[in-house]
Structures are given as C-alpha cells and as structure tokens.
Amino acid sequence: MNKFFSILVPHYNEPVEVIKPLLDSIAIQQNIDMNEIEVVICDDGPDAILLPDEFLKSYPYDIQYHREPKANVSVMRNKAFDYSTGEYVTWADADDMYYTCLALWFVKKETQTPMQVPINGVPTTVNGFDALYSVFLEEGRNPQTGETYFIDRKDGFQFIHGKFFRREFLVRNGIRFGDDLSIHEDNVLNLQVQACTQNIKWCPVPFYLWKWRDNSVCRRDPLYLKKTYPDLIKSSNYSLEWLTNKSKFDKAREVVASITLDAYYTFCHPSWKTIETQEYRDGAERYFAEYFKKWEYLWNECPDQVKMQISSGIRQREVIQGMEMETETLEQFLNRIKNLS
C-alpha cells in the first residue's frame, strides 16, 4: 500500500537512544492517520549499529529497515528514496527530531492549499507544492558555559532539514543526491529543485529540530568549514554538471557566480590568513582554481547585475562575521587564481 508521507533516514552509528526521539516525534503526530506514514531507514554498511526488530515494530506506523553495502550518507538517502512509496517525501537525520506534534498535519494541509506561481511569466494558481521549505531550529551549546540555546535557521537553503518534496516531481526531473558527495551534499538537491520549479512554498514556522550531538564534527571543530571548503566546491561542480546537462544555463551561471564570489570574500576573511589555516587556504585555492578554469565561461556570461546582487549579499555576511576590508580586488583575486591552474 502506497503511503502519503515517506520519512527517509540514513543511519550509521546512532544507537536506539539516539534515534528514538526522532521515531517518537513521528509517533505523536496529531490529526494524521498513522497508516499514511512510513519511515525508511537505510543502514550504511554491515558495521552500522543494528536496530532491534522489536524496537522498530513498537511504533504505530510502518518502518522499512534496510542493511545496505557501505557507501556514504548521499547513497543512503538515495537508497531510501528508491524504497519509498509516499506521495510526499522528506529526509531526516537519525539524531534529529520533529519538535511539534502538528508538523505532518501542517504539511499535509499545505499539499491541498492553492498558491500562485509564475508559469511562463503568467501568475497561475496551482494546488499544493513541488517543494516546501521551512525555517528549522538549531540546538547549540555555549562554548564557554555549556548552556543550551536555540536559533531559527531562516537561511537554511544549504540544508535538507525541514523540507518536503512531491515524489513524482523528483522522479520526473531526475533529482537526487550526488552519490560521491558526503560533505556539503544537501545544497546539491536544493539547487536541482530550485532549477526545476517555482512551485515552492515557504513556511516561516519551524517544525524540525537539528539537535545538538556532542560528537558532531561539523559544529565542534572550529576549522571544519576551512577543512571542507574543497568539498563545497566539489558539490558545486556536481551541480553545474547536472544543470548544464539539463540546459539550465541561467541557474548554472548563478551558481558559478555564487561560488566565485563566496571564495573571493571567504579568502579575504582574517581567519583564513593565519599560520594555522594556511594549509587549508592553499588547498582550497588550488581546488577552486581548477573549478574556475572549467566554468569560467559561465562566469563571463553571467550578467553584471546578477553578480552585483550576489556580491552584496555575500559581502554583508562576511562583514558580519568579521571581515574588515578586502585584501585584494576581485580582478586581482581571479588573476592570481588563474595562475594556480
């Protein structure tokens, strides 16, 4: 029997006590028939922690549980999607949860609510959505006091958290995670979605909680973004291959402009100029040089107005985060980068 909702969960080293809050938060959803819900869990390899059968069968909705060959989080997300039967799908991390008992009721209501979207430049009323993006909550810890805090993630387009998709839309457009991407992989799927539809609803009220976990590398290592910046460029390269193969050139030009300007302002930040980060900066610049060599033609084709809009947003972000002044002009940066390739 096909379901209305499929909640797709990659799983590796999360024991029962860690994944239980997620499954519990689904079980307490109100005004939703539990027969309409399935959770699809995919274990990443034979060394993944085995979830007991009696534990999974204790829930009032169906759970598919699959042990897959060792790969990575993107492959597990794709595998779970392939197993799913729901009309609408969403991905959730095994160590997160829904923090409101009305999350699925709200999303289902929005699948039946009309909205206006521009189709060929004409405002058109459509029912439901191809994608629903929402604010989500992030749980954090004060590094000095250990005190818990929560913040609204309103700019979370680089995350998959709190997003629902019409399954048929994803299948029809061949939208998937990149199988060889395991870091900064979420923005790949989000870019594909935005390139294929304007039928995206925005929910300003959060219902997904990105929980704190003590061994989370991405939030505990202060050098995480510097160490993984080449992975961000790799994800962008994958997106550009996908977009150009689909002849989505306007979106591809925006992506190149975004990464190019992000690299420029990021490398101007004082934190990238310390002895501690020199190794990461050198590696990231060499990786970006190869990227820019491949996609420079799209940068050159991107309208100046688009570049200016993107530049303004990124520069404002970096100033807020501590950049005082550009240490070189954009032209100087690009000329220097070209000499690295």
Enumerate the language-model features and the residues they cover.
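Short beta-strand/loop segment that forms part of the nucleotide-sugar
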Residues: 35-46, 64-69
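Glycine-rich, basic loop-to-helix element that forms the pyrophosphate-binding segment
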Residues: 68-84
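A conserved acidic beta->alpha catalytic loop
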Residues: 41-52, 93
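Membrane-interface aromatic/basic loop that binds lipid-linked glycans or pyrophosphate carriers
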Residues: 65, 115, 272-341
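Donor-binding/catalytic cores of nucleotide-activated saccharide
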Residues: 73, 94-203, 208-227, 247
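Short, well-formed alpha-helical segments that are part of the catalytic scaffolds
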Residues: 14-30
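Short aromatic/hydrophobic "clamp" motif used to bind/position activated sugar donors
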Residues: 89
